[in-house]
């Protein structure tokens, strides 16, 4: 990739899985059809929100806690380190340990598809396990079916 403008825009989540580094096991924490939006603004801010495809309506405190546990939401200022590294300086997040951190990802853009691969990290979704997240996004307005 040589043109940073290729990543600018609004992207919809098409697929998401976590791979446990130690075992190679793959987990789809949000199921086969996760929901998410990844907004990359030309002014240097990114906003990410992801949820499972199927959620119960939050009726009880337990339901609400479960929904929150499966949420991913953060924002911050980003920079692109060519050829393929995207770094977000997180300034607000659902998961307090991410605030003040830099979240680095590798990326590739092929047409209207953006693939993001995280560096090994820990997430509330998998406890203490070190995982690599793999996300496939499609540019909003081009998603079919």
What annotation goes with each model-predicted range?
Residues 1-73, 77-145:
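Lipid interaction determinants
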